[in-house]
């Protein structure tokens, strides 16, 4: 069954494996995960748990700041006997009998060697051209060429007389939800609520990441 936890990306470092190989790892701090709600097939049509991560300040009247929880969020968290949470996610296809509302989920849910999928929001790159954004090839840089990094033709002259939807063009790059699949858990540090994941994961330092059992290899 699926297992899941929320955390923040701390950065990257290196560790040595048992055979002496140097392994690049991403350090993820995943503490303060609390089960806010259980969803069952009988009531909701599917099995899932709702997990909250990082405390948010209690409701403050007339405040429009995001650092304060609103009344519905505060009431929802109170049912679980915890403070309102900044990030809330659902993990489906999970054995709900193993969890209770208000229970803390720690990093030792996973073990070294587990295969996982990690979801995060990719780094924003700003407005970029076709070459960087879509990997298009550039034109010649010499011999009288007038075509270097321009996108080229984007549509027909008279027959269609328009640019079709979905055409790859310059624009805002990054800031998308990205999932990297089939990463390996290298090490668990339960005392410091830290998971070491082999390779890189999406997002900047201090970015929120969602770690769950691999959808392709985790249940085999």
Curated annotation (Swiss-Prot):
Protein's name in the database: Large ribosomal subunit protein uL3
InterPro entries: Ribosomal_uL3 (IPR000597), Ribosomal_uL3_bac/org-type (IPR019927), Ribosomal_uL3_CS (IPR019926), Transl_B-barrel_sf (IPR009000)
Pfam families attached to this UniProt entry: Ribosomal_L3
GO biological process: translation
Superkingdom: Bacteria
Keywords: Ribonucleoprotein, Ribosomal protein, RNA-binding, rRNA-binding
Family membership noted in the UniProt record: Belongs to the universal ribosomal protein uL3 family.
GO cellular component, one term: cytosolic large ribosomal subunit
Keyword Transmembrane helix in record: no
A GO molecular function held by the record: structural constituent of ribosome
Oligomer and partners: Part of the 50S ribosomal subunit. Forms a cluster with proteins L14 and L19.
NCBIfam families the record matches: L3_bact (TIGR03625)
Record carries keyword RNA-binding: yes
PROSITE patterns, alphabetized: RIBOSOMAL_L3
Function: One of the primary rRNA binding proteins, it binds directly near the 3'-end of the 23S rRNA, where it nucleates assembly of the 50S subunit.
